[in-house]
């Protein structure tokens, strides 16, 4: 539960008021209109979570208890006699030709593939179940190429029931299937991999999943290829209960000249469930060939467990302002207390700003503590002069971080955990690069829970992608020094297919440029819908529902936002289209397409630019409450010749009808507004309302004629 600390000094109140984001009553714009561009999604617009029991998925059908080594191994082709069964270990050794072996039956033990580097080796699973409680089930040590294949019309099962591998254990392998070399998981049958306490499938090189029906359920990474992960024409259900689901770690160039670190989807169907990031790529993410992907993170995955990392000896204080010092008074009684000064510890990026950590030692000899905030010129460790102080707090064993939040004239605090970047298992760090702290979603933890995250670029060329994430739906980082020597660009490009995002933070965030060339983009729920250094809508159908800004262009010069084609709809509680560019009449460019923007907040504008914007083509309708900042929407270089503004009352469920040149818009309003309607395209535009219409539109739907 959040606690409130009353600010004792007006200085702090004024400072926080000046620095905080001013929504002026924005917030939720009031309902989630369905949008008017015909986009469909399997993602619901509520807090529903997803994921069936493993038993219902059939993943536990092959589990057995007790000791078993009832297996049949056959040489299908290639070098015969290249295996041994020693106790409960099946070992494949050197082959002198490309070879295919099969295995069936039950094994309580392990498989080791160590066939040398000269020839390809395939292991076919033909109705095979194995359970391992001592070491990881399958280890691939060598081979020119190694493929583990689920034979057509067979069901196969691998269970890793070992205890969790300790962070200090440098010998044990965390993956149920672990490979030191490039690994292919393929076939026309089915394979279920269940790792109770560790990773799913891990290749220290390239990992390829092709054709088969694959289910992986594990604690940490379901699929991890240090160099790359490629999924092609497969059907996968991938579950990570405390970590990132699909992950790469390297971003250098291989000896063959190949860029490492990309996660690729080439056709197929994939369900991804993650407690942290759904996809975390060290380089790029690529979606192509009509791949179908559904991603659920954090609380939207039924499999997620709490992700915590509690320090044994340190507490932290976290705040998003740097100019303060802190002290803690440990307390048992008026005669038994101890003052401790907090020291600066670290800074973490929060996307729209930084978060500053101060640390102080835990002291279990005291039952309570009270923390004090001081300005930079105040003395620490005293209670006569300070900015704010808490009440007495009971020491926590479950949490190690006191997170401070400024809201209005108050400071709030809440217990959470300082989660650092975690060993080889791949948990998200403090938000991961590019913003996982409490941005638009004040309830986020300190680990990154994005749908798709890359350290460079994200490209969606075709297919269908549904994301329901507790953090940003899609996030591309820039400014990361990659192992190939370059600096990441952080671009997101959507050139086709269908993208549907429900996010508790940003729908799509590009540290670099966000471009929609074609396809459909439907942001069902978000804090800010589309955000990038530049945002370019060049085609396709784009629909955005946002609690704050619909589109935010962060560039401070040039055209931060360009609309040049397609259909754009925004329904938001902040600024509809918001450019930070200070270029005179250049921060936003409308040059084509059809745009409808609805802002429900009186303190914001449907179109907001620092120094005006430009219009050269297309049709624009901007709806917002009269007064306030609405005059920003008329700061257009062509407004006198191409613009029109009309004041009217728009009722919830009523229809707005705009006739602008050859275009006609009919819009069923999801909210009542004493509106200013700004249009661009024809200075003689007709703007009217009516109570009914023959098109049968639901609230929030529209049609262009």
PLM regions with names:
Residues 209, 365-377, 685-691:
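A short, solvent-exposed beta-strand micro-motif common in secreted/extracellular proteins
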Residues 1-17:
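Sec-dependent bacterial lipoprotein signal peptides
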Residues 305-333, 642-645:
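Short, surface-exposed binding/anchoring microloops in extracellular/periplasmic proteins
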């Amino acid at each position: 539960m959040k606690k409130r600390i009353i600010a004792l000094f007006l200085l702090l109140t004024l400072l926080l008021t000046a620095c905080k984001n001013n929504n002026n009553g924005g917030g939720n714009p009031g309902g989630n209109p369905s949008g008017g561009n015909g986009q469909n999604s399997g993602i619901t617009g509520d807090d529903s979570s997803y994921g069936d029991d493993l038993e219902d998925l059939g993943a536990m059908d092959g589990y057995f208890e007790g000791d078993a080594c009832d297996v049949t191994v056959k040489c299908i082709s290639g070098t015969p006699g290249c295996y041994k069964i020693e106790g409960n270990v099946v070992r494949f050794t050197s082959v002198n030709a490309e070879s295919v072996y099969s295995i069936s039956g039950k094994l309580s033990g392990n498989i080791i593939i160590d066939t040398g580097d000269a020839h390809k080796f395939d292991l076919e699973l033909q109705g095979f179940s194995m359970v391992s409680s001592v070491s990881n089930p399958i280890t691939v040590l060598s081979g020119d190429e190694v493929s583990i294949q689920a034979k057509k019309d067979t069901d196969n099962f691998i269970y890793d029931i070992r205890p969790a591998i300790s962070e200090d254990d440098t010998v044990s392998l965390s993956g149920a299937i672990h490979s030191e070399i490039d690994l292919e998981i393929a076939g026309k049958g089915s394979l279920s991999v269940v790792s109770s306490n560790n990773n799913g499938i891990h290749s220290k090189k390239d990992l390829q999943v092709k054709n088969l029906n694959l289910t992986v359920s594990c604690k940490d990474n379901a699929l991890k290829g240090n160099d790359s992960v490629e999924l092609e024409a497969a059907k996968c259900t991938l579950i990570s209960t405390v970590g990132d689901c699909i992950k790469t770690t390297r971003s250098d160039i291989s000896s063959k000249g190949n860029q490492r670190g990309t996660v690729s989807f080439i056709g197929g169907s994939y369900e991804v469930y993650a407690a942290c990031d759904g996809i975390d790529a060290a380089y790029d993410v690529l979606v192509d060939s009509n791949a179908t992907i559904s991603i659920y993170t954090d609380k939207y995955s039924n499999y997620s467990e709490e992700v915590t990392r509690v320090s044994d000896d340190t507490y932290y204080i976290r705040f998003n302002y740097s100019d303060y010092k802190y002290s803690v008074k440990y307390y048992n009684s008026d005669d038994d207390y101890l003052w401790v000064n907090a020291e600066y510890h670290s800074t973490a990026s929060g996307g729209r700003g930084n978060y500053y950590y101060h640390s102080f030692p835990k002291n279990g000899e005291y039952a309570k503590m009270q923390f004090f905030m001081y300005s930079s010129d105040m003395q620490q460790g005293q209670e006569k002069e300070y900015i704010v102080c808490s009440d007495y707090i009971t020491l926590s064993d479950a949490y190690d971080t006191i997170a401070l939040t400024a809201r209005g004239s108050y400071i709030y605090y809440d217990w959470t955990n300082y989660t650092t970047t975690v060993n080889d298992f791949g948990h998200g760090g403090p938000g991961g690069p590019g913003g996982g702290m409490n941005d638009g979603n004040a309830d986020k933890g300190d680990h990154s829970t994005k749908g798709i995250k890359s350290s460079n670029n994200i490209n969606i060329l075709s297919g269908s992608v549904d994301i329901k994430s507790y953090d940003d739906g899609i996030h591309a980082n820039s400014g990361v020094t990659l192992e190939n020597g370059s600096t990441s660009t952080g671009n997101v490009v959507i050139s086709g297919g269908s993208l549907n995002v429900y996010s508790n933070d940003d729908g799509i965030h590009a540290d670099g440029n966000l471009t929609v060339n074609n396809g459909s983009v439907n942001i069902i729920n978000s804090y800010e819908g589309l955000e990038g250094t530049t945002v370019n809508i060049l085609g396709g159908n784009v629909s955005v529902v946002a609690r704050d800004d619909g589109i935010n262009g962060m560039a401070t010069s040039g055209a931060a936002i360009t609309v040049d084609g397609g259909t754009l709809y925004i329904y938001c509680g902040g600024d509809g289209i918001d450019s930070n560019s200070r270029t005179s009449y250049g921060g936003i460019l409308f040059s084509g397409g059809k745009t409808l923007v609805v802002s429900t907040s009186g303190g914001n504008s449907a179109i907001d630019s620092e120094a005006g914007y430009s219009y050269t083509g297309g049709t624009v309708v901007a709806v917002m409450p009269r007064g306030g900042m609405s005059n920003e929407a008329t700061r257009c270089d062509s407004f006198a010749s191409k613009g029109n503004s009309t004041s009217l009352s728009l009722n919830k469920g009523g229809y707005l009808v705009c006739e602008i040149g050859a275009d006609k818009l009919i819009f069923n309003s999801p909210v009542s507004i004493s509106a200013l309607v700004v249009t661009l395209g024809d200075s003689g535009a007709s703007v009217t309302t009516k109570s009914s219409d023959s098109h049968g539109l639901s609230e929030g739907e529209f049609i262009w004629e």
